[in-house]
Amino acid sequence: MGQSTDTLGRTSMAQFVYGKNVVKQMLMDNSKVKQIYMSVDDRDVERLARKQRVQLKRVDKKTLTQMTKTDRHQGVVAEVDPYRLYSVDEILQGVSENGKGLIIMLDELEDPHNLGAILRTADAIGATGVIFKKTNAVGLTATVAKVSAGAIDTVKCASVTNLSRTLEDLQKKGWWAVGTDMDGQDYRSVKYDFNTVLIIGNEGKGISRLLREKCDFVVSLPMRGKIESLNAAVSAGILMYSIYNMRFPL
């Protein structure tokens, strides 16, 4: 990506988070906020920016919309250092010795709201990390950051070229693959008392044939109502908390 500057003096490599609460949290956490852009008055943001010695610049609403590619910025945008990505090996360093790691593998997930929500739940249950593809999938964006409510900075994420090969490598290290599909066995029939790679598929296509063939288990969520399926983030959230409940019962 090029380094040309725009009228605000930013380079094309600039990355943003937006929304009053998200920006406030980043400032309170002393995250690496480079600059704040505002089209509204917010005393808390202004106070925190002064405290952290972060430059604040007044711009109009249209400029913020152009910067973030959305009109849901609430008049407050922070320019931040690029979101950190980890290697798979770095993610594995966080696995405890009791054999109860949980990695969420996302197969060409496209909706940033789904990714953000999955990161938020992954943080809540203490997941080991999240892995997604470098291409044909959503990455770490401003929308993902906002929806994640800060989890984008706390959950270790890896972006890989080949999910199938990555899964094979994990299985060689003792991880078990649990795929998701409407035709799978009831998710409650699996104990999850092993290092688990939980695979969540694309919003429309589900998980790919290659990944499904490599799965040790394929599970589904029972649907007793009239709706046939659940949103990817909702399904992932139910499964993540179910695994947590099985591993850490009261």
Question: What residue spans do the PLM features occupy?
Answer:
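Structured adenosyl-cofactor binding patch, chiefly the S-adenosyl-L-methionine
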Residues: 24, 29-30, 124, 146-149, ...
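RNA substrate-binding interface of SAM-dependent RNA methyltransferases
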Residues: 28, 38, 54, 93-185
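Short, acidic/turn-prone active-site loops that include or flank metal/cofactor-
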Residues: 41, 61-64, 135-137, 203-205, ...
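Short basic, glycine-rich beta-strand/loop surfaces that mediate nucleic-acid
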Residues: 67-82, 148-152, 193-201
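Active-site/ligand-binding-proximal alpha/beta "capping" segment
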Residues: 178-227, 231
